Every structure is written in structure tokens, then in C-alpha cells.
Design a protein with these regions (language model features):
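C-terminal binding/interaction regions
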Residues: 2-67, 72-89, 95-181
Length: 181
């Protein structure tokens, strides 16, 4: 039978460091940070091919309108981020919006998701998760027509807030987004 051992403060500190910091995953401690306005914009693309593109454009997809459902999925993705990515903090999301742009040239749909919150940590992962949820929903509704779909180029475009301030993707932004933040 193990007996309880009384330890001093120094031994307790060593024990806590051993248990909680070495060889384990830990959520970043944001308890001492102040809440500030945070915003992020992410994007991603799905190439669907001519047949699927035309069906979406003409609102004749067999399982319904992928664009409308993808916009709803993006909201759910944003809200569920901390449940799906283990070390993400649950955040009080103040706003999210999704825009899906159809590109007839390469037969793709590009998803843009913006998220904002007044929080202690950024909303980049929430924006990226919103994009991914929308893209996967489009994939799900389109695969019945053509399973040869390609999700590509999911990335953070802009983040704002916190001590690092404003960051814009060095690869540049689409022209219509250059002055968004």
C-alpha cells in the first residue's frame, strides 16, 4: 500500500514541471493575457471540373445547393474548432462570415471565411476550420457526380490583433481583398 508523502514547495515545483511540461501536450496558458479584438481571414479552393461546376451554377446538383450548405458548414466549423483541434482554446466568437466565389476559368469554388472575437488569443484556426468545413461540404455534395475533386491552397490571408498586430500573407491577397482590414 502506497503511503502519502508530504513534500515541500521546491519538490512540488519540480514534480509539477516534470508532470506538466516535459513530453506532453499543453494548451498555451493565456490566463495573464488581456482580451483584445482579434480577426482573421482564410481561404481555400476546390476544383470541381466542368460537369459539377455547371450543375452548381445552374442549381441542379442532385443533393442540393452546395454553396448554401457550405456557408452554414463554415459557421459550424468555426464554432467547433476547439472540439476538433485538441490544443485550441474555446473562444467567444463575435462574428463569422463566409463568401464562396465561383471561378469559371479553372472550374473551382474559392471559399473565404472571416472570423472575429474579443479574446485572449487569435482566431486564425477558426477561420481555417471554417474554410475547411465549407470545402469538405462542397466535396461531399459533389462527389456523387464526380469524385475526382481537389481541395487546394487552404491558407491564412490576414490576421489582426494581439501583440503582433496586423499580418498579411506575404504571397499577396486577391485584389478585391487588398483593403479589407
Amino acid at each position: 500500500m502506497n503511503k502519502l508523502k508530504i513534500v515541500n514547495q521546491e519538490e512540488l515545483k519540480d514534480w509539477a514541471e516534470e508532470i506538466f511540461k516535459k513530453n506532453s501536450f499543453n494548451m498555451v496558458d493565456v490566463s495573464s493575457k488581456k482580451e483584445t479584438f482579434r480577426r482573421a481571414l482564410a481561404s481555400g479552393k476546390i476544383y470541381v471540373g466542368k460537369e459539377v461546376f455547371d450543375l452548381i451554377k445552374n442549381k441542379k446538383m442532385p443533393k442540393g445547393d452546395p454553396i448554401s450548405l457550405a456557408e452554414v458548414s463554415a459557421v459550424l466549423g468555426v464554432k467547433k474548432t476547439s472540439e476538433l483541434i485538441p490544443l485550441c482554446h474555446p473562444l467567444p466568437i463575435d462574428h463569422t462570415a463566409t463568401k464562396i466565389v465561383m471561378n469559371e476559368v479553372d472550374r473551382s469554388l474559392e471559399v473565404f471565411c472571416v472570423v472575429s472575437a474579443f479574446a485572449k488569443t487569435g482566431v486564425e484556426m477558426e477561420a481555417i476550420m471554417g474554410v475547411n468545413a465549407a470545402l469538405i461540404t462542397i466535396y461531399d455534395l459533389s462527389k456523387i457526380v464526380n469524385p475526382n475533386l481537389k481541395i487546394d491552397n487552404v491558407k491564412l490571408l490576414i490576421k489582426e490583433g494581439g501583440k503582433s498586430g496586423l499580418w498579411k500573407n506575404p504571397d499577396g491577397l486577391p485584389k478585391f481583398l487588398e483593403n479589407i482590414f
